[in-house]
Amino acid sequence: MSRPRIVFMGTPEFAVSSLAACFELGDVVAVVTQPDKPKGRGNTVTAPPVKELALSRGVPVLQPTKLRTPPFAEELRQYAPDVCVVTAYGRILPKDLLELPTHGCVNVHGSLLPRFRGAAPIQWAIAHGDTETGVSLMVMDEGLDTGPVLAMKRMAIAPDETSASLYPKLAALGGEVLREFLPAYLSGELKPVPQPSEGMVLAPIIEKDQGRLDFTKPAVELERRLRAFTPWPGAFTTLGGKLLKVHRAQARGGSGAPGTVLASGPDGIEVACGEGSLVLLDLQPEGKRVMRAADFLQGHKLAPGSQPFVAG
């Protein structure tokens, strides 16, 4: 076929690489993204990154507050899309929109489906201790990331990987999977394959309180969750009734009652967990900068055997 007419739907920085790929692969006739939102301490109304790229390329931008309305479907129909490419748009598409393009809607998802269906696949892959992840290109249906898969691209998860470091790598991989496989799908050469029934794991949206360190849990689990929830919501505990963020930690094999300080010094603050121990390396007291444990201890005496942290 000649250059396909593409409607792109996406919102955050993660989707920018996919949109850039679409500009190479066809004519992007419209971009659908979430409405501008207040951001930062000043609550400055900010456009989504996808919108900024679209406007720089002179592409019409649609920012509906609701998708399930006939007027929006009709507006989209006027662009006569051959395919809709969706990457991290942030909303579930109704059936009439899924069926509107000639070749339906395809989605770039940040996991190896069916593992980690849902809103936070990058975070949960790290939290589960997976050593491999990737992106999946699938044909969308009405379910939550349940559509048949066209292709996958894989990559290793490093032992010290955080969501912050993995995010741009998978975003770039999303652009690659589109460049490599979207043309073959549109030509009919590549057929989607149903997802296997086994191996499904959900990746629900992250809530702020999930960053709280529960020292009754295994240290390995806490260390993974710290990396998974970096940068948001971060890992935190309380000390003396005040918030204490933990930016870097290491799992060890120490033992003791959960929440007990086993050792404290230049090498960190070792806290007993339900299984093993967690050495706190970089900390941020409430209202202050991030600092090494050694600097933190200059103003806070945490003697071995003390229990300054809430265990659960």
UniProtKB/Swiss-Prot annotation:
Its EC number is 2.1.2.9. Pfam families: Formyl_trans_C (PF02911), Formyl_trans_N (PF00551). SUPFAM superfamilies: FMT C-terminal domain-like (SSF50486), Formyltransferase (SSF53328). It comes from the Bacteria. The keyword Nucleotide-binding does not apply. Keywords: Protein biosynthesis, Transferase. One of its GO terms (molecular function) is methionyl-tRNA formyltransferase activity. It is an enzyme of class 2 (transferase). It catalyses: L-methionyl-tRNA(fMet) + (6R)-10-formyltetrahydrofolate = N-formyl-L-methionyl-tRNA(fMet) + (6S)-5,6,7,8-tetrahydrofolate + H(+). InterPro entries: Fmt, Formyl_trans_C, Formyl_trans_C_sf, Formyl_transf_N, Formyl_transf_N_sf, Formyl_transferase-like_C_sf, GART_AS, Met-tRNA-FMT_C. The keyword Protein biosynthesis applies. PROSITE patterns: GART. Attaches a formyl group to the free amino group of methionyl-tRNA(fMet). The formyl group appears to play a dual role in the initiator identity of N-formylmethionyl-tRNA by promoting its recognition by IF2 and preventing the misappropriation of this tRNA by the elongation apparatus. This is Methionyl-tRNA formyltransferase. The gene is fmt.
